[in-house]
Amino acid sequence: MNTANLTLSRLVKTLVTGLALVLVGPLPAQTATPKDPKSPVLGFADGRGPSGPVTLKIVAPAADELIPVPEAPVGQPPTKGAPVTLKVELANFETFEDEATKSGQHLEILVDNIGAMFPWRDATKPYTFKSLPKGTHTVRIFPVRPWGEAIKEPSAFALVTFHVGEKDGKNTAEPGSPVLTIVAPRGKVKGGTGKVLLDVLVTGCPVAESSVPQSCRLRYKLDTQPEVTLTKLDPVWLENLTPGRHAYVVGLTREQKIVPGAFALYQGSFEVENGANPAAPGSAPPAKATGH
């Protein structure tokens, strides 16, 4: 029996059916991106910039572009996918890698809703996937700090939907529908003291209290811990996590229901490794729980 999958299934069922909502935090403040921030975690480089409003634009592929699948060589099985090259225009955000810490600012690429992301360290050069499978795909790209926190300016997030070989209608963000993007945690994370960064991006609706028109609430559940509801997009530090695998679910809700759309609900897992991970900064306290 796959325990992780079973746990995820239970978490999704709990979140979708709904628990009582308790809103936490004030209305989100419209603040500028901090300039040259110090890393909140030892072992990671400090941030640089930005030098102005961060803007990111996907130049290729074009929206709704149909990328042909190359024919297979004679005697070989049919080709199942095609190379896809990404090109972007990025302004006012420096990408770099620090030699001492082997960390730095870069872009992250997310294809559809898979669990892994792909770091893009030099946005002046194209990024090519050797083969994406046939069908419709949505790629999301955004800049991150060395410690994994995303830049949250609206113009710093870019999304494009295209097709490889055929249009199957899957992995499509409907126009105007909210889009939830999980930045962290993903994969393996250091957690000697049990503190792990939870960071997300949301487009298509403001994350705020229900009194704000067209707003959404951000709800997450980790393992068997009480569900948490947030009304702002500040990063959250998950505390007291033991080494090993943890399952979690994050969703965008209105009136205690998941909002419609292909990218409004995410279920995944991450692994906390043994090793030092310093305490999170005091400015980012853990969110309050909503109860069992």
Predicted features and spans:
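Short, compositionally biased P/S/T/A/G/V-rich stretches that sit at domain boundaries
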Residues: P34-T79, H163-G191, A289-H292
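Structural beta-strand segments of beta-rich domains
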Residues: A72, K80-L86, G192-L198
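Surface-exposed, short loops/turns at beta-strand junctions within beta-sandwich domains
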Residues: F129-T136, L238-R245
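Short acidic/polar inter-strand loop motif in beta-rich domains
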Residues: V144-K152, V228, R254-G261
